[in-house]
Regions:
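Alpha-helix-loop-beta-strand connector modules within alpha/beta enzyme cores
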Residues: 3, 9, 55-82
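Hydrophobic faces of well-ordered beta-strands that scaffold small-molecule active sites
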Residues: 7-9, 45-47, 77-83, 108-111
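Active-site beta-loop-alpha junctions enriched in small/polar residues
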Residues: 10-14, 50-52, 82-87
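Glycine-rich anion/phosphate-binding loops
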Residues: 22-31, 61-64, 91-96
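Conserved, mostly hydrophobic/aromatic
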Residues: 30, 37, 48, 110
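A structural motif
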Residues: 39-42, 107
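Extended substrate/RNA-proximal surfaces in nucleic-acid metabolism proteins
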Residues: 88-111
């Protein structure tokens, strides 16, 4: 029997290159791995930015470096970033509001 399946690719987590030299950390590496995952059938990409402690604009800028070209190539992609490490939920999610503003109404960001 056939069942629809939604594949999510969690492409990097918080693993540093010292633990796994193949983990995508830079914007170029995240871009390449995300597009490869989408081409292989993933519907959703989950990726952390380069530094989990970055907040606000700094976190958003890092995501945007990778995700602007990904979403230009694959506007149908579903993407969700991680929350950042912070005391309050407002600070933890501040970068997502910036991303939504920067990327506009066509953004498909899950959370």
């Amino acid at each position: 029997m056939d069942h629809p399946v939604i594949i999510e690719a969690a492409i990097n987590g918080t693993a540093p290159k010292t633990r796994n030299p193949n983990v995508p950390r830079t914007a170029a590496e995240v871009h390449d791995d995300a597009l490869a995952s989408l081409e292989a059938g993933a519907a959703i990409i989950h990726a952390h930015n380069e530094q989990i402690r970055w907040i606000g604009q700094e976190a958003a800028d890092d995501y945007l470096a990778a995700w602007r070209p990904i979403l230009e190539a694959r506007p149908d992609a579903l993407w969700y970033p991680t929350g950042v490490i912070a005391e309050s939920i407002d600070v933890r999610l501040e970068h997502t509001e910036i991303l939504a503003t920067e990327l506009g109404p066509g953004l498909r960001m899950a959370y």
